[in-house]
A protein has these predicted regions:
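Hydrophobic/small/kink-forming positions within alpha-helical transmembrane segments
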Residues: 7-10, 14, 45, 74, ...
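C-terminal transmembrane-helix exit sites in multi-pass transporters
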Residues: 27, 84, 103-125, 256-284
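C-terminal-most transmembrane helix of multi-pass membrane proteins
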Residues: 40, 44, 139-140, 245, ...
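Membrane-interface helix-cap regions at the ends of transmembrane helices
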Residues: 18, 22, 45-63, 131-145, ...
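Structural motif at transmembrane-helix junctions in multi-pass transporters
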Residues: 25, 33-37, 82-100, 177, ...
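Hydrophobic alpha-helical transmembrane segments of multi-pass integral membrane proteins
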Residues: 1-4, 30-53, 68, 124-132, ...
Length: 318
């Protein structure tokens, strides 16, 4: 099931770029932060509304641990997506998708630090492969030691996605029901995104203009149904059944789907909406960098990790 979540998230990368292109056609003076806020707010309002209709009474009888987890997941996710979506406007969909996977390195290292235990050799080898892949994919300049804005923001977003995965791994949340947690997460994310609209909008009167565009609404609906409701429901339901390290590395499949879809979806989106978003191509950097990151995931799956005990409440609060 987590593979299906990766398919949906892979679709989100070309979709988000398409929404940004359509937004700029409608409101050319918009900042990238305002564009990001306008992507996120309707996405999570729709997701919360659909879930509340589909699962009536989902929020009834929520326990304190479910509330804490829902709010925590929302905060990690919304901050991560703000940086990821803004960064995606300054780099390609494929590059963003692969760089997001830096949490594949951070999760085992973080768990080792918290538990004062060294990860097995296979984790270190995989980490080196991912680091090399990131350097190649981002065209890292070793002389100036600089990355572009899009790449930096994407790497920052990965820190928050790591926090989201680790929160699902906590033992004090093991008995939580995934549906109420997911619905609350969507509501908190929607509220945060609306605050961001208020802060970044040149004029609030500009916002309704977006809803006059059939392509913008269509892209947003697809992002909501597949990449939000579908992907997050699957993640919150199935990811707690495996270790955080295994989950982080399984999610390395996401950029493979994103890169594949970025080869043909931009042209289809452009034809429908009337903007110029060219199909991406398989460059040497993408093949080598993406291949190294994918190899790290394959290595972990071929040689499975010993299952670590999830973080206890005391460990999580340290």
């Amino acid at each position: 099931m987590l593979v299906l979540a990766n398919v949906f998230w892979g679709l989100s990368f070309p979709l988000i770029k398409a929404i940004a292109f359509e937004h700029l056609q409608l409101l050319p003076a918009s900042s990238s932060w305002f564009i990001t806020a306008c992507m996120l707010a309707p996405r999570f309002v729709l997701a919360a509304a659909i879930m509340l209709v589909w699962r009536r009474g989902a929020l009834r009888g929520m326990t304190p641990p479910e509330i804490r987890q829902g709010v925590g997941l929302a905060l990690f996710a919304i901050v991560g997506m703000v940086f990821q979506n803004d960064g995606l406007q300054y780099t390609s969909a494929s590059t963003s998708a692969f760089l997001t996977q830096i949490y594949a390195i951070l999760i085992p290292l973080w768990l080792a630090l918290r538990r004062r235990r060294l990860p097995p050799a296979v984790v270190w080898i995989s980490c080196l492969l991912v680091l090399a892949g990131v350097a190649v994919l981002a065209r890292f300049d070793w002389r100036d030691l600089k990355l572009g804005r899009g790449e930096i923001e994407t790497l920052v977003s990965s820190l928050f996605f790591m926090g989201q995965i680790l929160m699902l791994d906590r033992t004090d949340f093991a008995s939580n029901r995934p549906v109420p947690v997911t619905v609350l997460m969507f509501i908190v994310e929607a509220a945060a995104a609306f605050v961001m609209i208020g802060v970044t909008a040149p004029r609030l009167a500009d916002v309704p203009v977006l809803f006059t565009s059939v392509p913008w609404v269509g892209f947003t609906m697809a992002l909501t149904l597949f990449c939000t409701i579908g992907a997050f429901t699957i993640m919150n339901t199935w990811q707690p059944r495996i270790t955080a390290t295994e989950a982080g590395l399984i999610y390395c499949l996401e950029p493979l789907f994103a890169s594949f879809m970025a080869l043909f979806l931009p042209g289809l989106f452009s034809h429908w909406a009337g903007f110029a978003y060219p199909n991406e191509t398989l460059t040497a950097n993408l093949l080598v960098g993406g291949g190294l990151i994918t190899a790290a995931n394959v290595l972990i799956q071929v040689k499975p990790l010993p299952r670590l005990t999830p973080l206890t409440p005391a460990e999580a609060r340290r």
